[in-house]
Amino acid sequence: MPRDTQKSKVYKWEKEFFGDIQRSSVWTEDQCVKYINEAYKWWTSNKDANPVKVNFLNDFNRPSSSYFRPASNCIALQKNIHTNPIVCSHELAHYIQHNDVCRGEAWHGPVFMRVMLTLIDKFTEHSLGDMIKSARAAKVKVAGLKRPNSNKAIRKPSNTFYIPKLTEKDLKFNSSEVYTREWYEAPAKIAAA
């Protein structure tokens, strides 16, 4: 596997682009599991896709980060700080890269970024174009629609094959607010005033 040379750049970009939402616990465990599995079905265009195994960790007895473990094919989320759409999409992108797109690429490489940004674009109000432009300005590489060193396309899901069974209620925060760009930009607007 190639060296993960842009890992720190990816984390830095996520923190700058998404702000505090990235380290917020805004969904219940059930919302996280449903989102991950529905988003995975959408990606694969397969309503019968095997469920993605998701575990929840307490930050006092595990490393403080969430992660995907290829050996167990499991996503682990810190339940007190990482139950939100950004971290769920980040870890699901690792799962998709490992299982469906192209094993052997760097964990935070251009292919991973394309998958993650596609998920975030589909399931939040962040624009794919804005995220790619921002990431590339931060020197984070994002793959085009073809796999590196290959003529094969990175599979871009089609909305016509599987419509995710996610309602507005499924995407609400624990505080009953729906995750929207306005919600997440509001603290910055208040601070600037």
Task: Kindly give the residue locations of the regions a language model identified.
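Short, small/polar residue-rich loop motifs at catalytic or cofactor-binding pockets
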Residues: 82
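Metalloprotease/metallohydrolase-associated module, dominated by Zn2+-dependent proteases
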Residues: 9-65, 70-78, 101-193
